[in-house]
Design a protein with these regions (language model features):
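Beta1/beta-strand and adjacent pyrophosphate-binding region of the FAD-binding site
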Residues: 1-13
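Core beta-strand elements of the Rossmann-like FAD/NAD(P) dinucleotide-binding domain
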Residues: 2-3, 180-190
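Short hydrophobic core segments
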Residues: 8, 185-198, 342
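Active-site substrate-recognition segment that forms the wall
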Residues: 19-23, 80-82, 197-322
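Glycine-rich FAD pyrophosphate-binding loop
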Residues: 23-42
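Dinucleotide-binding Rossmann-like beta1-alpha1 core, especially the glycine-rich loop
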Residues: 47-121, 128-130, 247-248
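Flavin (FAD/FMN) cofactor-binding and adjacent substrate-gating region
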Residues: 90-162, 168-173
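C-terminal catalytic lobe of FAD-dependent flavoproteins
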Residues: 291-367
């Protein structure tokens, strides 16, 4: 039976849910507070890492589920959204051993490389004590991906409304009512809340068990070098030669070689944040590049900002209570899974079970 579904939020998670719900024949309307392609949240920019390499097998399985969906999205939208680049993980050998084990079990084995082999293949990148190369990784074109998701949903009948903030969600009978700041009341069979760092507002009063969400302003940088698109994605895990908590990630993009610290930014209010670059954060990344990225020598980094919305255990929230499904807590690593998360949301809207790892009210310890 086709349902009337309101999706609150048109970033990665909301757009993914809209596409997969509309693909199943549901009548979908997306309510996006800001304008098309806005830079107020976590889904903007030119690049995100796609990778299969995770220490937790469930995430590798989820990435494998997302991969054919990204390709299907490209076919439906006519847009290229995922470019294969391969990826290099380097750092403590025990970390790489675990990644290699998970990849091998998934039938996607990586290749171990010495620092010298890394330097020979990618002269711009200096590896730590050991490295693991996995060819199935790539670069997701973030802005294009969100636009493609909404476009593909629209081709299947979904409507997208920009402007107007959702002020309240109420359960009504077997469905829900969404109230906007224009005093408009919209009634639906189901509501999907996918508003990133703003989730505690609309979700208040209609779901319980939402974990604390830590909203931070992150500050990656681009080094504008001409060969940026030839670089692999890379993750430098802390320990061994790196003492930055959370490690450093990087990848090539049309804007240059992008690097950033994982979850190292200050806590902010998503409605009231200063986007002025933090000189100390910029210096940390500049110092890192001087030691580990000889390929960007002589270029000045260009900073940008975005939001992380992080749960205590860095697992996502994807769960339903009644007619309301919540997608939140991307925790700085959700983009690669986008369409697969949309599938999980569609399952929940249709009454299917969720994954315990992503449940509301879970008691997983903080990492």
């Amino acid at each position: 039976m086709a349902l009337d579904v309101l999706v609150v939020g048109g970033g990665l998670m909301g757009a993914s849910a809209a596409w997969r719900l509309s693909a199943r024949g549901h009548r979908v309307t997306v309510l996006e507070r800001f304008g098309p392609g806005h830079d107020r949240g976590s889904s903007h920019g030119t690049s995100r890492i796609f990778r299969l390499a995770y220490a937790e097998p469930s995430y590798t399985e989820l990435a494998l589920r997302a991969l054919p969906l990204w390709r299907r999205l490209e076919e439906e939208s006519g847009r290229a959204v995922l470019t294969p680049t391969g990826a290099v993980d380097h750092g403590p050998p025990e970390v790489l051993e675990r990644l290699a084990e998970v990849l091998a079990r998934a039938g996607r084995p990586g290749r171990r490389l010495s620092p010298g082999e890394v330097a020979e293949r990618w002269p711009g990148l200096r590896a730590d004590t050991a490295a693991l190369y996995h060819p199935d990784a790539g670069r997701v074109h973030a802005d294009d991906a969100v636009a493609a998701l909404l476009d593909a949903a629209g081709r299947r009948g979904a409507k997208v409304r920009h402007g107007g903030r959702v002020t309240e969600i109420r359960r009504t009978g077997g469905g829900a009512t969404v109230v906007t700041d224009a005093d408009e009341a919209l009634v639906a069979d189901a509501v999907v809340v996918a508003v990133g760092g703003w989730a505690p507002g609309p979700a208040a009063g209609v779901v319980s068990g939402l974990p604390p969400l830590r909203v931070t302003q992150e500050q990656p940088v681009h080094f504008p070098v001409p060969d940026a698109l030839e670089w692999p994605s890379f993750i430098h895990h802390p320990g061994a030669g790196l003492r930055l908590p959370g490690g450093v990630y990087g990848l090539g993009s049309v804007d240059g070689v992008k690097i950033g610290l994982h979850g190292a930014g200050p806590v902010v209010d998503p409605d009231d944040r200063d986007r002025t670059p933090d000189p100390a954060a910029l210096d940390r990344l500049r110092t890192y590049a001087e030691e580990w990225l000889p390929g960007v020598a002589g270029t000045e980094p260009e900073p940008l900002t975005c939001l992380y919305t992080t749960t205590p255990d860095e697992d996502f929230v994807i769960d339903r209570q009644g007619a309301v499904t919540v997608l939140a807590g991307c925790s700085g690593h959700a983009f690669k899974f986008g369409p697969a998360l949309g599938e999980l949301a569609a399952d929940l809207v249709e009454g299917g079970p969720g994954l315990p790892r992503f449940a509301l009210g879970r008691t997983a310890p903080a990492r």
